[in-house]
Every structure is written in structure tokens, then in C-alpha cells.
Amino acid sequence: MNKNIPAFHRRCHGLVQGLARTLLLAPVLLALSVPAAQAQTWPSRPIRMVVAAGAGSSVDVFARLVSERLSKALGQAVIVDPRPGANGTIAAQAVASAKPDGYTLLYAGNSALVVAPLMTKDLPYDAEKDLEPVAPVVYVPLAIAVGAKSAIQNIQELVAGAKTDEVFFATPGAASLSRLIGESINQKAGTRLVNIAYPSSPPAHTDIIGGQVPILIDGLGGIAPHAKSGRMRLLAVSTASRFAGFPDVPSISEAVPGLATPSMNIVMAPAGTPAEVLDLLNRHINEITADPAIASRFIPMGGESAQGSRQDTAAMLREQRVEFRKLMQTANIKP
């Protein structure tokens, strides 16, 4: 009998065991390699940017400016897809349920990402778990405005008058950040502002200009053209300091100390999108918004360019959810 046969058997047995281990690990190794492979080949086709606002709105215009530059940076078309309605939840749901492959993104503001989910019953998605931040794009302050013929001349007069009498304020929706700004003023200043929720911004603007409602709280981007044309007068912006585009307009904190609510447009993606894809998008979008040519176009439209990491953006959204949830409880606002 050949003395080398046992050694040969041992070698064969070792090879068989090694092959078996490789076969068992193959699915795991393949699964781990898929995200990396996707990131290396992404994007290989056009990307859809779902916008939580109507075509022609200031949110839509901001999204198109960024998408145009992002297309050039990525070498693929970024197609803007406006999906207005339901305070942004229609657009958010479309993206939350999309395949997390980097080819479907959401462009939305705080109302759609924070306020509407807190104030809407039975949403078919979880805004915190089903969506994740890609990058901030632009700070868009909310503004408090009156019609040009209003007797209210400044924010101090509004606050003083609303402490003794009910004053109605128009917003573009009951589940909007605009409404919570009004409720915040009530809580901090002891005013009696009463919300009139419109289905969208345009009819609210029409009634403010016509004098049917005395006060408007809405995004500065939509109000800015009316303010510049003289049809509305700005009383305050919702930020902690004055806005560069309207330096003569006071911040709300000048009349109500401690009150400031940052409002931001953010690009989001379905949860589970490869981190490499999200990081690449974050880098490109930060570069785009830091470009003075883009930043200078934001300001006349009521926006100030923003940059930040995915982690910092996620933290900001979490903080706002906590803040607004407490405000809703204090003001007895229920979904």
C-alpha cells in the first residue's frame, strides 16, 4: 500500500472543507460586495428628484438650480418631479417607498419632514426611519407679512395688539411649520393668534393682498416677490438674526426674545441607500451650495445657502421633532 495515500486523503479532505466554507460564505460575500459595486457604478442612469412642492414654487426653483448643477457633477440627468399636496407627505411617501439605490431622491422642507408627520394621522411611512438625510441645501426663513394697506406697521404692533384681541393669521396648511410659528408666538409672547389654514400658499397670498385676512406666515421665498412689488409688507423673519436679502426686516427674536425657528430645504433618500452613494451626493451638493454663483442666486429668492454633514442634518431634524412635539402638547394640537 502506498504510504502517501493518507497524506493525499488529508489534503483532499482539507480542500473539500475549504470549498464548503467558501460556498457557505459566498452569499454573504456577494451581499457585502453589492453596495460597493453599486457605489462604483452609480449613477449609470438618470436620477429622479421628487419635490415636495408645486412646479414654479420657490421650493421647486431651488430644487431645479441644485439639480442642474448636480447633473453636471454626476454626468447623469437629475430629473425634477414636483409632487405637491398634503403638506409634502405625498412626495415623501413616494420616496420612502422607493428602491434605496440612489436613483430616487426627495427635496423637501421642514414642514414635510418634521411638522406634517407629527400632525398627520396614519401616514403610511415613518419620516424618521424610512428616510435619511443626504445634504442641506438652503435656509429658507419663514416670514410674517401683512397686506400693503394694513394698519399694522411692525412686528411690535402685531404682538401688542394680539395680546388683547384675537388676530387671525393665514398659513399654507394646518400641518405646516407656519402654523407652529404662530403657536410659538402665542406660547412665548402671550398672544392670541388664531390660524386660518389654506390648502396652499397662493390663495392665502391672494387674501392677504386683498385684506380678507390680516396676517400671513409663510416661506420668505414665496412672499419675497410680493414684498418687492409693494403688495405685501414684511414684519419679521423667523430666524435668530436678520436675513441678508432683506436686512431692514427684523428677526422675530427682536420682538419675541428666544423665538427662532430655522427652516431648511434638504435632500433626502430612502433609508438603506448605500452610504457611499449618500456620501458622494453630500460632497457634491455641499460644493454646489458653497459656490458663490449659486449662493448669490438663492438670496433674491429668500434663501441662504447651507452646507453640512449627513449626521448634523439628521441631528437637527431630531431636535426639531422633539421641540415641535412639546409645542403641540403645550398648545393641545392633535393630529
Swiss-Prot record:
One of its GO terms (cellular component) is periplasmic space. The keyword Heme does not apply. Keywords: Periplasm, Signal. Coiled coil: none annotated. Gene3D superfamilies: Bordetella uptake gene, domain 1, Periplasmic binding protein-like II. It is found in: Periplasm. InterPro entries: BUG, Bug_dom1. The keyword Signal applies. Residues 1-39 form the signal peptide. Its main location: periplasm. Belongs to the UPF0065 (bug) family. This is UPF0065 protein BB4329.
